[in-house]
């Protein structure tokens, strides 16, 4: 009975997969209890239907907009001090120990961060969103991924690099993208729709739809037909 109820809850929340028959009922009860506590904590802190785990920090909450059924795992920090509204799409997820940093220095007010519907990132992901990060719908990502949406200027030999300021273009990822673990995204890069990014890649360029990319720096390895 509990399994059937859990399956109905999955379908209602937009999850299309079928529950494995080998999953014990005790695990389902444990998950339901944890999700209930997270939902209660999220509602008390945001007044929205957000599943918020323990030890999370939300800075400038009024500039953070949550869709339905957003999950923020434990020990996540979200910096809402930025020019644009931080947006989390429906059923999106941020893995534990991740950090969204929008304004890292008082010399530049950051742009912001957006993630679409049904998109999720794994644990220990760093979003340097001062130059802006946009992630589309149905994007799945592994752990230990980093985004760096600005670059330090270094062309003036008469000044220290740290005194030359920064430039930023932003980072964009399309819809239906799979990103492997430990990928690094550099400022100005963009990934098209229906793409795969191999684990460990360093992405600095703009890539079209329907490709598999990988390597340092990342290059097109194969087209998806």
Which residue stretches match the model-derived regions?
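Flexible, glycine/small-residue-enriched loop-and-beta-strand segment within the central core
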Residues: 72-187, 224-225
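N-terminal capping/interface segment
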Residues: 1-16, 59-62, 68-80
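A generic "binding-loop/recognition-motif" signal
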Residues: 62, 84, 131, 209, ...
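N-terminal extracellular ligand-recognition/capping segment immediately after the signal peptide
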Residues: 56
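C-terminal/domain-terminus segments
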Residues: 190-214, 218
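Extended beta-solenoid/beta-helix repeat architectures
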Residues: 45, 50-51, 72, 82, ...
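Terminal amphipathic alpha-helical/low-complexity segments used for targeting or macromolecular assembly
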Residues: 1-49, 138, 144-145, 149-159, ...
């Amino acid at each position: 009975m509990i399994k059937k109820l859990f399956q109905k809850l999955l379908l209602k929340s937009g999850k299309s997969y079928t529950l494995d028959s080998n999953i014990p009922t005790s695990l389902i009860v444990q998950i339901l209890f944890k999700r209930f506590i997270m939902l209660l904590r999220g509602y008390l802190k945001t007044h929205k239907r957000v599943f918020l785990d323990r030890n999370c920090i939300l800075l400038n909450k009024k500039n953070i907009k949550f869709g339905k059924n957003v999950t923020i795992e434990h020990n996540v920090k979200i910096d809402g001090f930025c020019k644009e509204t931080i947006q989390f799409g429906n059923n999106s997820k941020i893995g534990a120990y991740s950090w969204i940093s929008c304004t890292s220095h008082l010399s530049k007010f950051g742009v912001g961060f957006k993630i679409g519907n049904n998109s999720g990132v794994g644990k220990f992901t760093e979003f340097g969103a001062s130059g802006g990060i946009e992630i589309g719908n149905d994007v799945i990502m592994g752990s230990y991924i980093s985004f760096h949406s600005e670059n330090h200027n270094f062309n003036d030999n008469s000044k220290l690099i740290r005194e030359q300021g920064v430039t930023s273009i932003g980072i964009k990822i399309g819809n239906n993208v799979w990103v492997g673990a430990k990928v690094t995204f550099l400022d100005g890069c963009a990934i098209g729709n229906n793409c795969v990014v191999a684990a460990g890649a360093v992405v600095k360029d703009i890539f079209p739809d329907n490709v598999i990319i990988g390597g340092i720096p990342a290059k097109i390895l194969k087209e998806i037909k």
